[in-house]
């Protein structure tokens, strides 16, 4: 299965997800959203995103369970994962040993314009004038 050049956001907080969707899509990042762990697992197995942004606290499966499940699969285990959570990284030291987890962001510290630039760099997406103009202004 071919990996799509899109990002999957997994978060049950709809208001936060709407904010991410609006900002990142406006910057030209192809972003999809899953509200539950089961919805995310189905998406990953059928669509294979290029990057996953996952919260650790979900209503059905927690983010860690998803990360561990995907790590054992040859296809999903190759997808880079960035944790975006309100739980501090120091309270979750296990993520350092998870083979597909590359980054850990504390939700309260996320700056969406910076996240957008980092996603673009990771996916090899071009930087648009709109993005650089907004950062300069």
Label every model-predicted segment.
Residues 33, 58-61:
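Residue-level signal for the "D+5" position in two-component response regulator receiver
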Residues 55:
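Active-site residues of response regulator receiver
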Residues 18-22:
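Charged docking surfaces used in two-component/phosphorelay signaling
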Residues 33-51:
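Acidic, metal-coordinating helix/loop segments flanking the phosphotransfer/catalytic sites
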Residues 1-8, 112-137:
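Non-catalytic signal-transmission and effector/linker regions of two-component phosphorelay proteins
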